[in-house]
């Protein structure tokens, strides 16, 4: 059973998250031949202040 975890800085719309789930699911089906019912995708919305880029929070970088 393929299980994908996606970490993203918060702020994506529900529609964007749906698209990520659909496309990652399809990629796993194509790559592994797993039935769709067995694919899992978990999106982690990470607050900007909890995401570091080159030693600075994404919030401080204006991301």
Q: What are these model-predicted stretches?
A:
Residues 2-63:
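A domain-level signal for the structural core that forms small-molecule/cofactor-binding pockets
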């Amino acid at each position: 059973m393929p299980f994908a975890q996606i970490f993203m800085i918060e702020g994506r719309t529900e529609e964007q998250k749906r698209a990520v789930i659909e496309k990652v699911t399809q990629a796993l089906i194509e790559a592994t031949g797993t039935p769709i019912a067995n694919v899992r995708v978990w999106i982690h919305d990470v607050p900007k202040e909890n995401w570091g880029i080159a030693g600075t929070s994404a919030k401080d970088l204006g991301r």
